[in-house]
Amino acid sequence: MKKDDSLKKIKYKVAAFYNFISILDEEILLIKEELTNLATNQKIKGTILLASEGVNGTICGTENAIVQFIETLEKLLKVSDINVKYSWSEKQAFRRFKARKKKEIVTIGLKEINPTKSVGKYIKAGEWNQFLEDPNSVVIDTRNEYEIKIGNFAGALNPQTSSFREFPAWVQKHLKPLIEENPSLKIGMYCTGGIRCEKASSYLIEEGFSDVHHLEAVSYTHLTLPTKA
């Protein structure tokens, strides 16, 4: 088989994206309608969640269609730097397109948490291992138990949650006492895609934690990098 033959089979581009940004209710309805019309015309499939705190979604379509969709979304949100990751698929990854208005784009269950106002400090991928090796740091995996079993950074705290809603209770029971005993510890968090640890950092800041960091837009591929024992 020629080298290019395998590439010809890959017809579809997948985009996983999110952005914490304040959106008015009336704007949500307009954005939902325009994106739904575009997805229908371009035969894009997937799911998008829209809320007053931003947008979160995963879609699949031809490369040109996905490029047009992301450009349209950025225009509607009035941003130029939406958090998006791309991958490829030999077939359409989803059955239909759904755009939904929700209370949260990632559910933690606390109305007062607002990542559009405050989040932790970003850690670049190239600086992550240095943070892991810092004896004055504590690292938290904000993913659920199922995801953690697939792979994680050695030494990271596992909250043992089945859903993100359980994270605040774990913080109150386990993390708060730890930081009270060791107030100089820096907190670092990671997840898949970046959305959960970004919102988790907003929650920690709201709870009074000061030295809060999170890995910028981590993916499963990053989990293969060296970890501390």
What do the predicted segments below correspond to?
Residues K3-L24:
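Short glycine-/aliphatic-rich beta-strand segments at the starts of folded cytosolic domains
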Residues N19-I21, G57-G61:
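Short beta-strand-to-loop capping motifs
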Residues D25-Q42:
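Short amphipathic alpha-helix segments
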Residues L50-V55:
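Short Gly/Ser/Thr- and Asp/Glu-enriched loop/turn motifs at secondary-structure junctions
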Residues G57, Q172-V218:
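Catalytic cysteine-centered active loop of the rhodanese-like fold, especially the PTP/DSP P-loop
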Residues E63-E112:
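Extended, charged alpha/beta regions that create polyanion-binding interfaces
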Residues I105-P183:
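Positively charged, proline/Ser/Thr-rich regional signature most characteristic
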Residues H222-A229:
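Single conserved hydrophobic/aromatic residue that forms the stacking wall/gate
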